[in-house]
Amino acid sequence: MPLPSRASSTPKISKACVPCRTRKIKCNAAVVGLPCGSCVSRECPDECVLSARKRRTVKGRNAEVPRSRKNIPDTNGSILSPRQQQLPTNVSRQTTDSSHSDPVEESIHASHTGSSLRNDTPHSRDRRPPGQAQADLLYLNILQDTVNDTSAAQTDASDHQSNDEPDDSFNSQIHHWNPPPQLDDVDNEYLAKKKVFELPPPRFMDDIVKAYFDYVHPFAPILNRIDFIQSYRSGSCCIFLLHAVAAAASLYVTHDVLIGCGYPDRSTAQASFFSKAKLFHDFHCQGDPLSMLQGSMILGAIILDHPSDRDFQYWFHNSVRRASKMGVQNACLRDDGSQKLYRRIWWVLHNRDIFHFFINTQNMRLLANAPPIRPLTEADWETEDIEQWSGILSPISQAQKVSLIAQCELAQIFGNVMSVVTSSNPSAEEIHKRILPLDAWRTSLPERMHLMASFAEGEIYHLEALTTSYRFECIMCRLLRRGRWQMSDGGLREWAQQRFRSAIFELDTIVKRVMINNMIQKLPTTFITTITALLALHIESALDAAESSLIRSMARISVQHTMLALDQIRDTPAIKRALPAFEIVLSKNKLYPMSTSDTEQINTMQTMSQDQALSDGHILQPPQTDMTLPQDDQSFLYGDFIGFDFLDRWQMEQLDFTGIY
């Protein structure tokens, strides 16, 4: 059956598109127009363009480029997304639009989806080389390799000649045999009713974007800030990515912004944005591959106030899948303008891969066999001119760059430690050797981040990095002293016990310092989840009969301080979800006064904790409680507090928020 032709709507094309020329494969753009069948089959139609020197606009591609925001009508003060403008018509790739995009918008859109045409094409950076096709089935993979190997020998002249031949491209044939799913009118109507294609009013959306770049992006710089702002302003930004950004930033915007967006609190706002992004993803409303990857990575760092099957583990796996499919690890090796962005993306994924495995060794390392790339440096950030966007973007500081670099180094240190402790015959000497660089790493941070003596904004990145390091040291030492890896060396367990207590003390100090400087609400989710893990460790120590009375008393005092910290961020969805579970545990064991009448007692314990001891040398003793628990409740003492297994034993819903690093 003859294939549908789009040539009638396009001018005569006498050469292959840029991606096909780069890959040295046949291009049927002369027959079907742009995007060609090869680019469509690889799900990268936005990358299908002619060489930049042609300087002409192909009408067939105009239907793929969203209109500028200035042409988008305002509905109840909300911005309509580019996709919503096409409703209720079908959104298949064959649908044409009579409107034409401004060439400037096309260049901005192309820049956001990969890079400008002045450098190598996004396809040449993001995609695997011709021997590594992306077919899902083995036989298709083999056939594609055969076709690509044959086509690779062709010259540009043969490419030019093949453009006038009938469409016999293997990739195009695969696309027509197995077309991607399309949304029908019912799907479009459902998504429209869910307001998936709508964004908050522009003035509030600007506040959300600014909050994202101020409080979220510095710890995971997976966006090219200038490209994102340009595509956002032009209205061509992927709606999935925008909803993901809004979900992450909803923790940091003011209450007035939440009200202006139509949400009464942070939990409702975050859940709404998260749900819209999830629907966009589940209905296969595909944006460009890079935006889908970035959005998945952002959603992978979000914890809702209720359980979800699409938790951070799901989005992390999805991010790795998309990154591998795009060939991000190969793009990191190229020397072009987009290399910096892809290197940062790959290192963020690499860090998460190690930390997810470190938290729970039952998790599989997804990137363990990935080819190594050179370490991240300060040169891996773009040189930006943000004067035009100064109302949204702030300059990137030295501390922000060093923060991610330090996280990468930390991941390498703990990755080396885990390779030893999980080996068949780990030795104490080897563990000591692998953990030794951690102390030097911590000592070097203040100088590398150019910190001042007084508490400044840059101190946030320093404290966040230290918090992550002490948290994972607690995890490792706690498991070592509990014999998790069958370590029979008594000296090693004593060493692990000492380092565990020192790390707990440092975490307590950091939390208090952040509270005193009123900075706790500006810290990322990774810091917030560390506070919950810290509280669980204090509860464990307070209820551990094997601990001395001194340790148990100090743990009880620390519980009060940690609960005060959580109270400062109780409107955060992750904490809102955790507090009821903690309150049940604490109330059941009389570790925390739950009534307002006990406020004075809390303040007294805070004052006494500063001096550590009374004037007569005795440690402050909490009210006597019956430490004998029912048999059903004793079992949680032997569970993993970091994973909150003890809550499962009380038939509480599983809380996965400590799993996020």
Swiss-Prot record:
> Which positions carry the signal peptide feature in this UniProt record?
none
Q: What induces it?
A: Expression is up-regulated upon exogenous application of fusaric acid.
Listed InterPro entries = Amide_Lactam_Regulators, Transcription_factor_dom_fun, Zn2-C6_fun-type_DNA-bd_sf, Zn2Cys6_DnaBD
Q: Where is this region: Disordered?
A: 57-131, 151-185
Annotated Gene Ontology cellular component terms: nucleus
Q: Whereabouts does the entry annotate DNA binding, in residue ranges?
A: 17-48
> What's the practical application here?
Fusaric acid is phytotoxic to plants such as cotton and banana. It has been shown to induce programmed cell death in plants. In addition to a mild toxicity to animals, fusaric acid exhibits acanthamoebicidal, antioomycete, and antimycobacterial activities.
UniProt lists compositionally biased (Polar residues) regions at: 73-98, 110-119
Q: Where is the composition biased (Basic and acidic residues)?
A: 99-109, 120-129
Any one Gene Ontology MF annotation carried by this entry is:
DNA-binding transcription factor activity, RNA polymerase II-specific
* Keywords recorded for this protein, A-Z: DNA-binding, Metal-binding, Nucleus, Transcription, Transcription regulation, Zinc
**PANTHER family xrefs:** FARA-RELATED
What's the protein name?
Fusaric acid cluster transcription factor FUB12
Which species is listed as the source? Gibberella fujikuroi (strain CBS 195.34 / IMI 58289 / NRRL A-6831) (Bakanae and foot rot disease fungus)
